[in-house]
């Protein structure tokens, strides 16, 4: 009985730690997302009207593709990842419940969103060079 209580307390403590680690990572990714969207907008604003017209269709298609790609990528279960692919907060995944798994999906989406947006900024900066 005492062992079970101790085990449950450890389990709860590990879950709280996992949640804290996830909250910290969410804050970082959300801050990155704000910056990267701002940079993308600035990059776009630097184009002439003519350049914007040339790129408009491509840009619209890119937004859609980024969204779909990231939704697919974010559905990959942490259990399908190798240790080297896992972020620090994911190494506690054995203590996750459904809510934490759902939150991980959101984080993976944001991470992908940021990465693809950064790649797009690089592309746009070179498109007319």
List where the protein language model places each region.
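N-terminal alpha-helical modules
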Residues: 1-129
């Amino acid at each position: 009985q005492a062992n079970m209580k101790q085990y449950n307390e450890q389990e709860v403590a590990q879950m709280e730690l996992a949640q804290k680690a996830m909250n910290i990572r969410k804050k970082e990714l959300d801050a990155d997302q704000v910056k990267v969207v701002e940079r993308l907008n600035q990059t776009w604003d630097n184009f002439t009207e003519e350049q914007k017209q040339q790129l408009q269709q491509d840009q619209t298609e890119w937004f859609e593709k980024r969204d779909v790609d990231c939704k697919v990528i974010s559905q990959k279960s942490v259990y399908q990842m190798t240790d080297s692919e896992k972020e620090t907060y994911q190494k506690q995944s054995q203590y996750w419940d459904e809510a934490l798994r759902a939150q991980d999906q959101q984080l993976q989406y944001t991470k992908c969103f940021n990465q693809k947006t950064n790649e797009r900024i690089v592309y746009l900066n070179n498109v007319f060079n």
